Structure formats: C-alpha cells, structure tokens
Amino acid sequence: MKVREVIRILENNGFRLDRQKGSHRRFEGVVEGQIRGVTVAGKESDEINKATLASIRRQSKLPNELFRSG
C-alpha cells in the first residue's frame, strides 16, 4: 500500500492534516469520541512496510478492513 492510499483512507474517515515537517505528516481525527493522532512518513509514491502500516492502524483506531489493499 502506498502512502497516498493511506492518506486518502485517513482523510475519507475524518482525519485532517495537522502539521508536516519534511516527509512526516501528522493527522488528527476523532474516532469513537476520542481525538486520535496519526503520523504518516514518506513520499506519497512510497510503499509502506507492514510494520509501519500496523502502527498507523493502531494509532488511528480505524477498522483493519479499511487498510486491506486489493
């Protein structure tokens, strides 16, 4: 899964870009009544490795199904 796909998933689920420094983007959104912060690193065309994607899923508290590619 590419960084741009993860960003699209976050934005489609109410997350908004809070700040950016270099290739690191910090998104904030409300999930289950709580403000969640998610950091996404890399250029939009970069592939995200499995461990990083798992961390993004944990940070966001969004359903795992949203992050399944295919």
Predicted regions, residues:
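A short, structured beta-strand/loop element
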Residues: 19-53
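C-terminal structural segments of small proteins and small subunits
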Residues: 43-70
